[in-house]
């Protein structure tokens, strides 16, 4: 079962990804985890990636793609994988196609969790964090018992600077522009499966399981 998971910030990718890997026994592979592992193991590509990251620069595609190729060639990917955060561009998607063709592991589905922008705005701007213990709340989905106060220690709750409406709106616009060509690419390939992410978490996952039902575990 070879899957790519897509969705805008706040769509619930992390939650659905955790459930998929738990139920189907495949590794959850994120770009960040791959970079960290390659740097920790001090592979040639990992060291090259580190040299860019240490300078605050973007890691070039050829290095990222090389790290992805190494990761997908490991034994735990024999029965499949869930890729999260890669690919981000059509060029990366084309490179991934070549890697998977070489390994004989074609993509089964690209699962895109769809959520309207106004719903994402509500989800992302409603987050509040305790200034003392760091516990995260949400004004709509997980509010504190007393507004503005942490249930655990009475600490004052604050909103992160990058959770304000203007910043979140800009971030979503950038993500939407970057993601659309990728969705078009996978739609043309016949891999794309859109899932309604505006339902309850359990209902979203029920739709994901229905989609994956025809695939071997």
From Swiss-Prot:
Residues given in the record as ATP binding sites: 10-15, 127, 136-137, 199
Keywords, ordered alphabetically: ATP-binding, Cytoplasm, Kinase, Metal-binding, Nucleotide biosynthesis, Nucleotide-binding, Transferase, Zinc
Signal sequence segment: none
Any one GO CC term of the record: cytoplasm
Primary localization: cytoplasm
Pfam assignment, any one: ADK_lid
Localization per record: Cytoplasm
Domain of life: Bacteria
Temperature dependence: Optimum temperature is 45 degrees Celsius. Thermal denaturation midpoint (Tm) is 47.6 degrees Celsius and is raised to 66.0 degrees Celsius when AK is complexed with the inhibitor Ap5A.
An MF annotation (GO) of this entry: adenylate kinase activity
Induction conditions: By superoxide.
Keyword Cell wall biogenesis/degradation: no
GO terms, biological process: AMP salvage; nucleoside diphosphate metabolic process; nucleoside monophosphate metabolic process
Region described as LID: 126-163
EC number: 2.7.4.3
Positions of AMP binding: 31, 36, 57-59, 85-88, 92, 160, 171
Pathway as given in its UniProt record: Purine metabolism; AMP biosynthesis via salvage pathway; AMP from ADP: step 1/1
Database matches in InterPro entries: Adenyl_kin_sub, Adenylat/UMP-CMP_kin, Adenylat_kinase_CS, Adenylate_kinase_lid-dom, P-loop_NTPase
UniProt region (NMP), positions on chain: 30-59
Enzymatic reactions: AMP + ATP = 2 ADP
Family named by the database record: Belongs to the adenylate kinase family.
Domain notes: Consists of three domains, a large central CORE domain and two small peripheral domains, NMPbind and LID, which undergo movements during catalysis. The LID domain closes over the site of phosphoryl transfer upon ATP binding. Assembling and dissambling the active center during each catalytic cycle provides an effective means to prevent ATP hydrolysis. Some bacteria have evolved a zinc-coordinating structure that stabilizes the LID domain.
Subunit structure: Monomer.
Protein's UniProt name: Adenylate kinase
Organism: Bacillus subtilis (strain 168)
């Amino acid at each position: 079962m070879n899957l790519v998971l897509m969705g805008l910030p706040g769509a619930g990718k992390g939650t659905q990804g955790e459930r998929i890997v738990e139920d189907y026994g495949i590794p959850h592979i994120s770009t960040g985890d791959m970079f960290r592992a390659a740097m920790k193991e001090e592979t040639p590509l990992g060291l090259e990636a580190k040299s860019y990251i240490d300078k605050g620069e973007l890691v070039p595609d050829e290095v990222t793609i090389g790290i992805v190729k190494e990761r997908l060639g490991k034994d735990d990917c024999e029965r499949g994988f869930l890729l999260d955060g890669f690919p981000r561009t059509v060029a990366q998607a084309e490179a991934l196609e070549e890697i998977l063709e070489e390994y004989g592991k074609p993509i089964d589905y690209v699962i895109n969790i769809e959520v309207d922008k106004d719903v994402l705005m509500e989800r992302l701007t409603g987050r509040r964090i305790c200034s003392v213990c760091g516990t995260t709340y949400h004004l709509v989905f997980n509010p504190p018992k007393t507004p503005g106060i942490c249930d655990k220690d009475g600490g004052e709750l604050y909103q992160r600077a990058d959770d304000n409406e203007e910043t979140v709106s800009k971030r979503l616009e950038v993500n939407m522009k970057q993601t659309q060509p990728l969705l078009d690419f996978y739609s043309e390939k016949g891999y794309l499966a859109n899932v309604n992410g505006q339902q309850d978490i359990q209902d979203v996952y029920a739709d994901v399981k229905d989609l994956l039902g025809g695939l071997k575990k």
